[in-house]
Amino acid sequence: MKKQTLLLLRGAILLLLCSAAGYALYQHVAGGRNEQAGTVLQQQALNFRLSTLEGGDIELKKLRGKAVLVNFWGTFCTPCKEEMPVMQKAYDRFKGDGFEIIAVNVRESKGAVKRFVERHGLTFPVALDQSAEVYRSWEIYYLPTSIFINREGRPERMYVGGMSERQVDMWIEDLLSGS
């Protein structure tokens, strides 16, 4: 009887520890964020030049004077797939207001990215970081990651994970208003 009680107690403690570790991981990766959250950044954005899905090039520094949302994503990434309609709505809404989106796909073939873009009706610029050079130099660790860059070329916010339409619109409006 004592052995059974001890075994049950050990099992309960193990379950409690696993639950606490799981909750801590969830809070770190996906939870604990409110609509206002996001890492605030100060330094100048690192320039990059990447090929686009259409065959041209896009260079970040040439967009100076515009508010820019750089979104690192992948076709395999569920939160990335879920936020693409949000990105398209934001692009449609703000593109005439001195705003641009660069969706930087990381390490996927041009064909896979093109199929994804066509299937989802995306019209904003899609850049291909097939070697993940920009991804690494910007010290991005998770997909999706979005960086909001002001008109002077300084990143103001970085958000890791999928974003709501409300968040995207609010942060773009902040960039455009200069606040």
Regions found by a protein language model. Give the residues of each.
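A short beta-strand-turn-helix
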Residues: 47-68, 91
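Thiol/disulfide oxidoreductase modules built on the thioredoxin-like
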Residues: 115-123, 128-179
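Conserved redox-active cysteine motifs that mediate thiol-disulfide chemistry
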Residues: 64, 72-89
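Active-site acidic short loop of glycosyltransferases
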Residues: 64-66, 96, 122-123, 140
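Structural microenvironment flanking redox-active thiols in thiol-disulfide oxidoreductases
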Residues: 81-120, 130-137
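Hydrophobic beta-strand anchors of alpha/beta hydrolase catalytic cores
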Residues: 69-70, 101
